[in-house]
């Protein structure tokens, strides 16, 4: 092709600007004609076939002519300024894109007659390929002076880059190498002219396209790995394609890494896309429940070649506040498959933060009100919240790569271990100015309604107690003790705090334990709510003996006080606290509990047992709690109990088991029954106790509660191994189902045969079902509820609520007045009958409420 020898600007003004727009129109018209006529193409219709082939041939020639124009510009010695040839790149890119789109859609355009024109379509594609390659060579020669602010030149370069970006989306599935080279050119030109075009580039479009291509190539890689895993024979062609695709993954990831590094300040609106990229990749990769099943070798290959590039990307984004906001958004609502990757991401952030400046750590580790509608929670709160969502991964459990230690092989660890180890490591590097945030986050998590989250926080807190100073541990124990004393009644937060107190107490230095004893003296009954939660094994021998003596003395005295008074139900709550403290003594005092103290406890327990009857235990929650505390106390002293008392206990429990009682009551019965395995029952009462024992075990083994079932199997095994009355063991197995259940337990085989894949699918379904009710609850709402240990559930307003409260307040006042009168003098004969009548009315109301519920 011949072009006159003139400078670029003159060529643009006299030729390109005049001819190229007409060329584009001509090409578009030919493309329209092709698409319209292609419907009638057939091997019989030679006229249409000839027409289409002529059009395609003309297009090939036109592309060749354009290539000649581009080559002419490249061949000149003149420096290339984009504004001087602005018609050429835009026209050429339009034609190239149109060509590639047509080639991509050729199967649907030409339907079953593609073979009639396939040779020309291939030629057309090759010409477009050559034209783009030549154009990129030309564009690489373009000079843009960073000191000259030429808006037209800047705009032209931005248009060129985004036009190439559009072409990328077309050719991504057509030619991987060409696709990668086009991306390489886009990144290169963006960085080359960065200082001039950085404010004009549509960074979000570039990042989004890159992330889409990363995900597409990654999914292709996984599909190939899955096919090779499922296939018995190793196909070298498949493996080469896998390696090629993996290489493409790495290229795209490195391109993203490079681009993000240079243009980070402009990526505010791309942070959500980058966050989703990380989550989507890890959701499809083992050990995610939603991962593609691939071999260990392929996992390691993908991780080593591709996943490693995500780590420096997170390092780059760590200091970028918009990324923090996306990751720690209080309203972040992720689907089930992305919750586990979010947890992994937060752990990665924890690992990287210690190397960051204090200012960055502070931003990540503190709450922030970003706007009226947007709140950023702290990293630690986010870790606990995210961890709580991984119920399926925790229950399987999934395993992750463990930490390497000197002289030991690396072992896989559970998600719980993974998070716990990294959390504790993070705590060691926590900046002192952020300790208040650490304390608040740990306490908030300990008070969580989710048991495993609370346990994780306790483990981290115990690590802090050991890692920190003795004074810090003592301070924390004192705070927890005050929190426990401030709880007005039973709630899950109180249970969590009591477990934490028991564990932390072991880490206290003896001098601080002595201070604790002085501050919360066991000589005072008001402190027994604390001592019921403390293991006396945590104390050194001298302090243990002292506190055991004091708790036992005060506890038995309080029991006698209750026995000597009116013995009202209202006083049972404090009595139950006393019994719980005495039980703690029995369970952990060891040799410090001498014979005299044992006798004193047995005496009051026997007297208290005498006041129990079936109706009270069946109907009254406080009596049920008393009953469930007396049973383990009786079991502890089973060898020294009066046989008549044992008979009474067994008879009462046999009757109660036929009623609907809470699980904790039946578990207490179970503990007592299993303790009878240590006892030789006197012949005089064997005929009355042994049948009841077999009946109790039969009823408990048939229970459908999984928790009770497990404990019953353990208790029955313990009883059967220790009892001298082997003859009743077969009598406990009342059905074939029960026998099979016990045999499976003894042989440690599951009740249900389940493949690993089926187990994963079941856990995924369960996770979706269990999480659904909480999907719309924000972190802020969870935080508010968990910081209030008094409330068992969020308050819900009902019609007439205030009237109900007023009526109950009146009832409570009347009961208090009656109690006061009883303390002043004897009750009239009619009072007992009237109270029975009131009790019946109360029971009727309770039944009515249950039917409404």
From Swiss-Prot:
Phosphorylation at Ser-43 by PLK1 strengthens FIRRM-PLK1 interaction. Phosphorylation at Ser-744 by PLK1 negatively regulates its interaction with PPP1CC. GO terms for biological process: chromosome segregation; interstrand cross-link repair; mitotic cell cycle; regulation of protein kinase activity. The keyword Acetylation applies. GO terms for cellular component: chromosome, centromeric region; cytosol; kinetochore; midbody; nucleolus; nucleoplasm; nucleus; spindle midzone. It is found in: Chromosome, Centromere, Kinetochore; Nucleus; Chromosome, Centromere; Midbody. Keywords: Acetylation, Centromere, Chromosome, Cytoplasm, Cytoskeleton, Kinetochore, Nucleus, Phosphoprotein. It holds the Pfam family DUF4487. The modification Phosphoserine is found at residues 43, 744. It comes from the Eukaryota. The keyword GTP-binding does not apply. InterPro entries: DUF4487. One of its GO terms (molecular function) is protein kinase binding. Its main location: nucleus. The modification N6-acetyllysine is found at residue 792. Regulates PLK1 kinase activity at kinetochores and promotes faithful chromosome segregation in prometaphase by bridging kinase and phosphatase activities. Phosphorylation of FIRRM by PLK1 negatively regulates its interaction with the phosphatase, PPP1CC, thus creating a negative feedback loop for maintaining proper PLK1 kinase activity during mitosis. In complex with FIGL1 may regulate homologous recombination. Interacts (via its N-terminal region) with PLK1; controls PLK1 kinase activity. Interacts (via the KVVXF motif) with PPP1CC; controls PLK1 kinase activity. Interacts with FIGNL1; may regulate homologous recombination. PANTHER family: CHROMOSOME 1 OPEN READING FRAME 112, FIGNL1-INTERACTING REGULATOR OF RECOMBINATION AND MITOSIS. This is FIGNL1-interacting regulator of recombination and mitosis. It comes from Homo sapiens (Human).
């Amino acid at each position: 092709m011949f072009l006159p020898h003139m400078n670029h600007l003159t060529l643009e003004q006299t030729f390109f600007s005049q001819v190229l727009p007409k060329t584009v129109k001509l090409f578009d018209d030919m493309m329209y004609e092709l698409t319209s006529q292609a419907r009638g193409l057939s091997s019989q219709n030679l006229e249409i076939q000839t027409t289409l082939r002529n059009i395609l041939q003309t297009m090939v020639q036109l592309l060749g002519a354009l290539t000649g124009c581009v080559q002419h510009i490249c061949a000149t010695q003149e420096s290339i300024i984009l504004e001087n040839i602005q018609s050429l790149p835009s026209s050429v890119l339009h034609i190239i894109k149109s060509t590639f789109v047509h080639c991509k859609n050729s199967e649907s355009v030409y339907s079953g007659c593609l073979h009639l024109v396939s040779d020309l379509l291939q030629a057309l594609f090759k010409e477009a390929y050559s034209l783009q390659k030549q154009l990129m060579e030309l564009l690489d020669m373009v000079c843009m002076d960073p000191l000259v602010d030429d808006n037209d030149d800047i705009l032209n370069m931005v248009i060129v880059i985004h036009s190439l970006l559009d072409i990328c989306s077309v050719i991504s599935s057509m030619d991987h190498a060409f696709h990668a080279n086009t991306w390489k050119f886009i990144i290169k030109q963006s960085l080359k002219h960065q200082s001039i075009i950085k404010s004009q580039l549509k960074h979000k479009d570039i990042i989004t396209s890159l992330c889409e291509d990363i995900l597409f190539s990654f999914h292709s890689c996984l599909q190939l790995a899955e096919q090779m895993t499922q296939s018995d024979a190793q196909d070298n062609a498949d493996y080469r394609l896998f390696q090629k695709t993996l290489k493409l993954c790495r290229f795209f990831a490195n391109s993203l890494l490079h681009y993000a590094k240079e243009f980070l300040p402009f990526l505010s609106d791309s942070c959500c896309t980058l966050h989703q990229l990380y989550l989507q990749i890890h959701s499809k990769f083992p050990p995610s429940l939603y991962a593609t099943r691939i071999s260990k070798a392929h996992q390691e290959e993908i991780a080593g070649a591709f996943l490693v590039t995500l780590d420096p990307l997170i390092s780059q984004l760590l200091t970028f506040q918009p990324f923090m906001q996306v990751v720690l958004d209080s309203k972040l609502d992720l689907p089930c498959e992305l919750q586990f990757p979010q947890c992994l991401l937060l752990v990665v952030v924890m690992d990287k933060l210690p190397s960051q400046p204090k200012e960055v750590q502070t931003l990540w580790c503190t709450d922030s009100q970003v706007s009226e509608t947007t709140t950023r929670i702290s990293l630690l709160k986010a870790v606990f919240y995210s961890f709580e969502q991984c119920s399926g991964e925790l229950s399987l459990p999934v395993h992750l790569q463990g930490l390497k230690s000197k002289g030991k092989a690396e072992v896989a660890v559970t998600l719980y271990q993974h998070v716990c180890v990294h959390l504790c490591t993070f705590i060691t590097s926590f900046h002192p100015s952020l300790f208040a945030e650490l304390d608040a986050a740990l306490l908030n998590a300990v008070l969580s309604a989710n048991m495993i989250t609370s346990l994780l926080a306790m483990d981290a807190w115990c690590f802090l107690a050991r890692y920190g100073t003795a004074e810090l541990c003592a301070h924390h124990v004192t705070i927890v003790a005050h929190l426990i004393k401030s709880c007005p009644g039973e709630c899950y937060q109180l249970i969590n705090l009591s477990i934490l107190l028991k564990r932390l107490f072991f880490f206290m230095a003896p001098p601080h334990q002595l201070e604790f004893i002085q501050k919360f003296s066991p000589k005072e009954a008001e402190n027994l709510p604390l001592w019921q939660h403390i293991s006396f094994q945590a104390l050194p021998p001298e302090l243990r003996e002292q506190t055991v003596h004091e708790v036992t003395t005060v506890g038995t005295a309080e029991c006698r006080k209750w026995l000597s008074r009116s013995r009202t139900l209202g006083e049972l709550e404090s009595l139950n606290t006393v019994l719980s403290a005495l039980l703690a003594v029995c369970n952990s005092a060891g040799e410090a509990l001498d014979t005299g103290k044992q006798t004193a406890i047995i005496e009051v327990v026997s007297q208290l047992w005498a006041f129990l009857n079936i109706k009270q235990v069946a109907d009254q929650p406080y009596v049920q709690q008393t009953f469930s505390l007396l049973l383990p106390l009786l079991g502890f002293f089973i060898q020294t109990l009066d046989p008549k008392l044992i008979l009474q206990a067994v008879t009462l429990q046999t009757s109660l088991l036929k009623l609907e009682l809470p699980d904790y009551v039946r578990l207490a019965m179970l503990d007592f029954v299993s303790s009878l395995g240590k006892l030789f029952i006197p012949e005089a009462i064997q005929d009355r106790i042994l049948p009841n024992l077999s009946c109790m075990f039969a009823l408990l083994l048939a229970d459908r509660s999984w928790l009770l079932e497990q404990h019953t199997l353990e208790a029955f095994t313990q009883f059967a191994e220790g009892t001298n009355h082997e003859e009743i063991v077969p009598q406990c197995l009342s059905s074939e189902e029960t026998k099979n259940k016990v045999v499976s337990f003894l042989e440690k085989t599951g009740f249900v045969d389940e493949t690993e894949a089926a187990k994963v699918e079941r856990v995924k379904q369960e996770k979706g079902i269990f999480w659904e009710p909480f999907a719309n609850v924000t972190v802020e709402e969870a935080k508010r509820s968990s910081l209030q240990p008094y409330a068992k559930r969020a308050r819900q307003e009902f019609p007439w609520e205030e009237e109900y409260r007023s009526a109950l307040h009146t009832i409570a006042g009347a009961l208090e007045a009656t109690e006061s009168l009883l303390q002043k003098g004897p009750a009239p004969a009619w009072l007992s009958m009237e109270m029975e009548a009131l009790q019946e009315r109360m029971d009727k109301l309770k039944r009515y409420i249950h039917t409404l519920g």
